């Protein structure tokens, strides 16, 4: 017998109950407006110097990157990056 809850299923069921069908998790249509706001509001600084982070899309080193602690303190920080050449965004 498992005492672990399936939070992902509960989350998806709550989304469907509240907003109807349209995807699961953060791919649900309810979050589309939040994704658009993030894309409009997040702008890297104008000129980006060549650095140490390499874009997996085009290989450029002109990448705007910042780190934030998104998990517990014993976990590594999360890197949020955006390539100034091709516009690719990723986290690591």
From Swiss-Prot:
Sample GO molecular function, one term: zinc ion binding
Q: Does the keyword Protease apply?
A: no
List cystine links: none
Q: Where does Zn(2+) bind?
A: 55, 58, 83, 86
**UniProt KW keywords:** Elongation factor, Metal-binding, Protein biosynthesis, Zinc, Zinc-finger
- Give the PROSITE patterns listed for this entry: ZF_TFIIS_1 (PS00466), ZF_TFIIS_2 (PS51133)
Any GO BP annotation: termination of RNA polymerase III transcription
Note the zinc finger regions (TFIIS-type) by start and end residue.
Answer: 51-91
Name listed for the protein in its UniProt record: Putative transcription elongation factor S-II-like protein 81R
Organism of origin is Frog virus 3 (isolate Goorha)
